[in-house]
């Protein structure tokens, strides 16, 4: 397990250090909400709680360390930060499969099931998952300001990372898949709604060096 985790950390941080790289990122999400109690139903509440799906594709070209809008590979590759350093003690299972055709390898990392609490004072992130993968940041910008979640209990049923590393040790593909289950009290213009969320969120990356 340590070998697989180290291989992933080494490859992802090497990709972040690249001065010239093209990053294709697809973000995909599906969210379903069910209402258990609602004080005053109205159209805005209904709009907020509608099931939504999204798929966005972005391509970033890093030249001499930055994109045209000043971002670096470190800003664009999840898990974010200069040093990913996913800890072995946060991983439930890690497997490496060697690709006999090209000498590369596939790494699959499975995190422990984790929980978090959200209250008006902010989010208490799961120690082994969201510290490295800000799962909620996968939501598209247009949905972030539609609700204010006043309190929530979040459960992360085993987030997974799938990574493909070529024979040269370079990260060429990566999927970050994060299922979420949550019960929450949502505020919409001072209306309180108790609801249940279930979501599957994914970031899929392809790297060209």
Regions found by a protein language model. Give the residues of each.
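Subset-of-secretome marker
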Residues: 1-209
